Swiss-Prot record:
The keyword Phosphoprotein applies. This is mRNA transport factor GFD1. Signal peptide: none annotated. Present with 2733 molecules/cell in log phase SD medium. Residues 119-164 form a coiled coil. Interacts with GLE1, NUP42, NAB2, ZDS1 and probably DBP5. Forms a complex with GLE1 and NAB2. Keywords: Coiled coil, Cytoplasm, Membrane, mRNA transport, Nuclear pore complex, Nucleus, Phosphoprotein, Protein transport, Translocation, Transport. Residues 29-44, 112-128 have a biased composition (Low complexity). High-copy suppressor of mutant alleles of ATP-dependent RNA helicase DBP5, which is involved in mRNA export from the nucleus. It may also play an important role in a late stage of NAB2-mRNA export. GO terms for cellular component: cytoplasm; nuclear membrane; nuclear pore. One of its GO terms (biological process) is mRNA export from nucleus. GO terms for molecular function: protein-containing complex binding. The gene is GFD1. It comes from Saccharomyces cerevisiae (strain ATCC 204508 / S288c) (Baker's yeast).
Length: 188
């Protein structure tokens, strides 16, 4: 007596096995520095992945992905750069419509009134710069005179201290006055 079950009517087909995801090779190897080969291998991996996706998809999605793969066109190759050859304007604009020749660019027209203002502004700028330079020169002269005067005072003091008994003073009051001035100048 055969057993009756819900599964008895099921077809005798093998279950669909899913493919394991393939591991990508890393192209970071020091020996493999050729960029052309690495680019081709990466594009091949992408193609393999898209083919695997097409096989794994079920139902209506399968036909859509196949059509997308067929519709994609290979990238257009760029023409090699011409060496010293001048191309007509139409060709350069066809390649890049935003590019312009260097000879086509001209400076914008300047009105006479604007030209006058630039000249007067430049005169004013030079006059103000000259005043500023004169001020700086005067400041530097004053600083130089002060340092020179300090050096002279220091030299006179050193001479006076080193030659303690050699100077003959006519008046003792004059000697005390000079010593007092030296002491006050050193304190400042």
């Amino acid at each position: 007596m055969p057993l009756e079950s819900i599964w008895a009517d099921a077809p005798d087909e093998e279950p669909i096995k899913k493919q394991k995801p393939s591991h990508k090779r890393s192209n970071n190897n020091k020996k493999n520095n050729n960029s052309r080969w690495s680019n081709e291998s990466s594009s091949n991996n992408k193609k393999k992945d898209s083919v695997n996706k097409v096989k794994n998809n079920k139902g209506n999605h399968e036909s859509k992905t196949k059509n997308k793969i067929k519709e994609t066109l290979p990238r257009e190759k760029k023409p090699p750069h011409s060496q010293g050859k001048i191309s007509p304007v139409s060709e350069s604009l066809a390649i890049n419509p935003f590019s312009q020749k260097a000879t086509e660019i001209s400076p914008p027209p300047v009105s006479p009134s604007k030209m006058k203002t630039t000249k007067t502004q430049s005169k004013q700028d030079t006059a103000s710069k000259m005043k500023l330079l004169k001020k700086k020169i005067e400041e530097q002269r004053e600083i130089l005179q002060k340092t020179h005067h300090k050096n002279q005072q220091q030299q006179v003091l050193m001479d006076f201290l080193n030659d303690e008994g050699s100077s003959n003073w006519v008046d003792d009051d004059e000697e005390e006055l000079i010593l007092q001035r030296l002491k006050t100048s050193l304190k400042i």
